[in-house]
Amino acid sequence: MIEFDNLTYLHGKPQGTGLLKANPEDFVVVEDLGFEPDGEGEHILVRILKNGCNTRFVADALAKFLKIHAREVSFAGQKDKHAVTEQWLCARVPGKEMPDLSAFQLEGCQVLEYARHKRKLRLGALKGNAFTLVLREVSNRDDVEQRLIDICVKGVPNYFGAQRFGIGGSNLQGALRWAQTNTPVRDRNKRSFWLSAARSALFNQIVAERLKKADVNQVVDGDALQLAGRGSWFVATTEELAELQHRVNDKELMITAALPGSGEWGTQRKALAFEQAAVAAETELQALLVREKVEAARRAMLLYPQQLSWNWWDDVTVEIRFWLPAGSFATSVVRELINTTGDYAHIAE
């Protein structure tokens, strides 16, 4: 299995280095749910600004403040502790008057707004995230500048970031041990993390192999293509390749790669043979996913950061802004720009 740092680059390995997350203010994330609170209902949506706090810690503190069980507070996604983040938490408080959440006090946190909502906020129920990153001590400005220009046109590999695999790859290692021993795993969180790491690693491997081809975005017979921004896909046939290639070039369609699991992967013929060959050596992880009935799915092979802009503060410091859809990783954008240094270079966003 290829480690994250050794995965194939779309724009070639960066020529320079830079410091990511010199301080939390250098990594700002604003969650975009894609909808507004209903204004009524048994739940309360709370938008919180956090600095130096992880999501679960804040959720538990909010539950304690509201005198409800911790399981009654949910969120759409985990956000990094070592960053400045805005995100929504959701508390189920039925049949009660609206509490004064401006009185909620927690070091590093500030309540920005809150309102009633009809439905629970579930994991993954967000549109995306807006990022503002500051890269410092950049050693090669010209290389980073050209890469930013190229990313606007060609995007980046839609890899799952190193954080998906746990500190030091612990989640992937856990999945491998589980696959090899067949010992039941009772802990629901471990099961979820390990299965997710296994499937993500196989996806990354398939994409890394595809990126070694001369024309990465060339549609081949049997490719599974996805309408940009949609979840469903269809299979490309030889007769349609020219027309479909035009739509891929226009970014109307996206070539996808497999998230292996039980059931059909989605590709056929030449494309399916390629994907199967790319992960042929990873029989244990594939068997684990089938055994645990993790359903196969698809994910876009490339990621196009939206609203991408940048501003050089000086020759060694650049501020970069962009928006990514839910499930995408900012660190997978950064790895195409610089070789990152710093204690938190691979920590989750």
Swiss-Prot record:
Gene Ontology BP annotations: tRNA pseudouridine synthesis
Database matches in PANTHER family: TRNA PSEUDOURIDINE SYNTHASE D (PTHR47811:SF1)
General function of this protein: Responsible for synthesis of pseudouridine from uracil-13 in transfer RNAs.
Family classification: Belongs to the pseudouridine synthase TruD family.
Binding residues for substrate: 27, 129, 329
Molecular function per GO: RNA binding; tRNA pseudouridine(13) synthase activity
Domain TRUD residue range list: 155-303
Reactions catalysed according to its record: uridine(13) in tRNA = pseudouridine(13) in tRNA
Protein's organism: Shigella boydii serotype 4 (strain Sb227)
One Pfam family this sequence matches: TruD
GO CC annotation, single: cytosol
The EC number(s) this enzyme carries: 5.4.99.27
Highest taxon of the lineage: Bacteria
Location of the active site: 80
Name under which the protein is recorded: tRNA pseudouridine synthase D
Keywords assigned: Isomerase, tRNA processing
EC class of the enzyme, as a word: isomerase
